Amino acid sequence: MSKFEIPVFILTAVVLIFIQITLVPIISVNRYIPDLLLIMVVFLSLRKGQFFGTVSGGVIGLIYDLASGNLLGSGMFAKTLSGFIAGYFYNETTSSTVLRSYRFLLIVILAALINSSVYHIVAGYEISYGFVSLLLSSIIPDTIYTGFMALPVIFYLNFRGESIG
């Protein structure tokens, strides 16, 4: 890992947190919003490994919780778990290929499903109606929207064409 990667990751995370708090609510569709921070956590998990993805998920989730005023620890726990799960798909030799393929999208969708489920359960949102209702009314739409927002990452990495890591 070069000495410039960590500052770039930190700067990218800060910019994405700012965008997630200020601009993403503007593009919400019926209160469904994509989770750009989760896309970054999955990207880091697949690029640098499970440990790095887990730690980055925890740090990004904590900073987001502090900046957004959400229940402290709910986003941190959800993103930590999502980074951990996404890290299972890390393979040093195929990392660049996975990030450029539909597999990245599928991993983002899986991580978004886990992230949204854990976040809503921990934060206690709409749980009084039951998990199936929560799944259909919030978790699945947020997951689909997050997956849709991961497509530009795949297109960019394919367009760029050079080695990622």
Indicate residue ranges for each PLM-predicted region.
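Terminal, non-globular segments
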Residues: 1-165
